[in-house]
């Protein structure tokens, strides 16, 4: 691939809201790990890293303005083959992004600061519920794909090879989505039920980067 092709794809990637979000999310969690690593040895550097993390986190909330409409639109449509799973996944996503607006506004001083913790909890709860059901749906589809792939491989034929390739590409994308959702679920649990493992800076940092980089892969132009 030429440098021009890569630059063209980067421009397309960053033109998407999800593309910008994944880039800033990378900044957010790299700076979290940098803060943790420098906290004891270089407090000044750690403070700068913390400021970068905070700024990136607030910027991502601003980028997500109106994103709850995606979940609302999903609820408006027929639930399809997944039925209740799809309804609960979209409802959780809608709650997450809707209350995230209030978390953002309270943290930047537009609303009372005491609201931030409460709104963050509600948002994280909705987020976690949504991720559980999105993960379940992706795992169901991966299982179906594996069964279909085995069937096609038994039958053989050139046309079947194309279908198998398509199934495998879909599986990779769903595995990436599952990895991102599991990582984000860990971050959500840290907000809902703080504990030493989920709330450790390394756990949060690695989880955030796994989610961000899986998103890079899924959204990168083909």
From Swiss-Prot:
Keywords: Membrane, Peroxisome, Peroxisome biogenesis, Transmembrane, Transmembrane helix. It is found in: Peroxisome membrane. GO terms for molecular function: identical protein binding. It is a multi-pass membrane protein. It comes from the Eukaryota. Residues 1-81, 218-222 are cytoplasmic. The chain crosses the membrane at residues 82-102, 197-217. One of its GO terms (cellular component) is peroxisomal membrane. Residues 103-196 are lumenal. Involved in peroxisomal proliferation. Belongs to the peroxin-11 family. This is Peroxisomal membrane protein 11-4. It comes from Oryza sativa subsp. indica (Rice).
